[in-house]
């Protein structure tokens, strides 16, 4: 459940080959407007979004469908985990250049993306966490991806930012990819 087409495409690319059908939830032709709580952790944000989505689908054709939500954040070591669960707000307000300004002169550029994917299915809630370690780059670089991808260099990316990776390369090492694959294993996907 998201209005972010990039997240829908990424989930589709990761879960469809595993036998899952991924569709963006539309109620009355509209993406549900979920309130993003300001919480201390991405787990709480994902659970809140999932609870809202389940409530919105009660009494609709989607009431018995599996619902997937994902929340993620960028956690920068030298900034005590900032922006963390406030990543969307920080991206919208100070953007990539603002984060790079906060990191100006900083030698400890370690960071990680964390994601939580949560599914409501047949009355059960299943969740999985994914982490991708790396560093914050010195400059904005790359044309692919979204969010903080142009300033995050995963450890496994040979010096390239997430925004310089193909969608396939990114999905094999990304926090979201790990979280989504973890949920798929919990769901025991249908046979192909």
Where are these regions (language model features)?
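Anionic-ligand binding patches
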Residues: 5-191
